[in-house]
């Protein structure tokens, strides 16, 4: 059983919900990425999503776009992100790490080479935003062969057929995008999310994490009531964008601890 599966199995046994924070590797300072990852874990993160910066992040809003631009300007690459994961693993062998990004950097490295290097670094899952599930069967097989979970997105516009396609190849968890549009946009409609989750869970045999639009403990708790996990990204990137460098890791840890407390107070209604 891999780290992601172990984590969600333990959460289910404890009646708790998963907390999955996202940060962009290398932003605002490449030398701080591993420290930030440890701060997230210490604050109570169950899984860490680490963004691989890309020059055309089409699914991301202005906040994460800016973070990608800053990281790229500082020389961050897919190889340097994998090196960060390897350094993180030296002192944290337990917290699952998922890389989130776009196909181009992986294809430039080569899918087979990426799978081997990601496995060696200690990556547990990969979410490629622009790999549609109906075209990702071979990619998913190669990831699983390297003991890496291929993770896919679903959205309010996903048809039953698309959900079923994802259910056939996803492992680890699926990421339900709670809003139409790009990351960091709009207001949450929890009742709409609650209406969609049963259709997903009836067709997808892995936990469902919900993200986009989650900004604080209140929205995290509300989403946790109807899902298996909460994903939060833009708010954390904003925090790092505005925090004083010397206090950024502590601010991350404090914010994640607040979300952790809120989620631990949420009911286990999604099971």
From Swiss-Prot:
It is an enzyme of class 4 (lyase). The active site is at 49 (proton acceptor), 60 (proton acceptor). Pfam families: Trp_syntA (PF00290). It catalyses: (1S,2R)-1-C-(indol-3-yl)glycerol 3-phosphate + L-serine = D-glyceraldehyde 3-phosphate + L-tryptophan + H2O. One of its GO terms (molecular function) is tryptophan synthase activity. SUPFAM superfamilies: Ribulose-phoshate binding barrel. Its EC number is 4.2.1.20. The alpha subunit is responsible for the aldol cleavage of indoleglycerol phosphate to indole and glyceraldehyde 3-phosphate. This is Tryptophan synthase alpha chain. It comes from Burkholderia cenocepacia (strain HI2424). The lineage of its organism: Bacteria, Pseudomonadati, Pseudomonadota, Betaproteobacteria, Burkholderiales.
């Amino acid at each position: 059983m891999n780290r992601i599966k172990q984590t969600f199995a333990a959460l289910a046994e404890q009646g708790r919900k998963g907390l999955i924070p996202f940060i962009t590797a290398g932003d605002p300072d490449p030398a701080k990425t591993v420290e930030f990852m440890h701060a997230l874990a210490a604050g109570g993160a169950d899984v860490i999503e680490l963004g691989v910066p890309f020059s055309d992040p089409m699914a991301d809003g202005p906040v994460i776009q800016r973070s990608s631009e800053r990281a790229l300007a500082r020389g961050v690459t897919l190889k340097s992100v994998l090196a960060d994961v390897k350094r993180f693993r030296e002192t944290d062998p337990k917290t699952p790490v998922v890389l989130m990004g776009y196909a181009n950097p992986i294809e430039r490295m080569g899918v087979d080479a990426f799978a081997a290097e990601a496995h060696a670094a200690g990556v547990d899952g990969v979410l490629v935003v622009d790999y549609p599930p109906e075209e990702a069967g071979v990619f998913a097989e190669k990831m699983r062969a390297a003991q890496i979970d291929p993770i896919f997105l679903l959205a309010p516009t996903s048809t039953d057929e698309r959900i079923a396609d994802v259910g056939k190849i996803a492992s680890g968890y699926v990421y339900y995008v709670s809003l139409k549009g790009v990351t960091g946009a709009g207001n949450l409609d929890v009742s709409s999310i609650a209406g969609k989750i049963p259709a997903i869970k009836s067709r997808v045999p892995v936990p469902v994490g919900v993200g986009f639009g989650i900004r604080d403990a209140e929205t995290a708790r509300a989403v946790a009531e109807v899902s298996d996990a909460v994903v939060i990204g833009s708010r954390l990137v904003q925090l790092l964008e505005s925090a004083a460098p010397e206090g950024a890791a502590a601010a991350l840890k404090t914010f994640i601890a607040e979300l952790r407390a809120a989620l631990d107070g949420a009911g286990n209604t999604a099971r």
